[in-house]
């Protein structure tokens, strides 16, 4: 929940952006300031917790949303996890990279279809599957 002062600041910023040419400004309905500088302290706590965790060699290539690039070494994993808490998500760049590297089917697991909607805006040619129930997951895996 935003304070009245913060709400007014957001309204002022949205109006300025629209005057500058933005087509629209949409407030997001989120439960916290995820992936923002406001969570830097949480990232530091995560870094402390990860100190005792051993990261093994990477066997399955994956892309971090911090850089929209592949994680190349186990030494980078903890740093990227910590940064992800308070860094912007490079979702579009990550998806574009995966598509460029041959991915043509994406699965969104969990409630809602937000990411699937973003996917369709990025590239309508890829297949997007939504799974929000265990039965749907089992059906997808056993197809």
Spans of model-derived segments:
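Acyl-group transfer acyltransferase/transacylase scaffold of fatty acid/polyketide systems
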Residues: 1-143
């Amino acid at each position: 929940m935003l304070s009245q002062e913060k709400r007014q600041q957001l309204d002022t910023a949205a109006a300025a952006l629209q005057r500058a040419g933005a087509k629209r400004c949409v407030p997001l309905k989120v439960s916290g300031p995820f992936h923002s500088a406001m969570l830097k302290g949480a990232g530091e706590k995560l870094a402390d917790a990860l100190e005792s965790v051993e990261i093994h060699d990477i066997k399955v290539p994956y892309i971090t949303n911090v850089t929209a690039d592949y994680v190349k070494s186990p030494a980078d994993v903890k740093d990227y996890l910590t940064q992800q808490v308070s860094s912007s998500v490079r979702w579009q760049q990550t998806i574009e990279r995966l598509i460029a590297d041959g991915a043509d089917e994406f699965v969104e697991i969990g409630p809602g279809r937000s990411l699937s909607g973003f996917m369709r805006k990025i590239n309508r040619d890829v297949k997007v599957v939504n799974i929000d129930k265990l039965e749907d997951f089992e059906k997808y895996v056993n197809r």
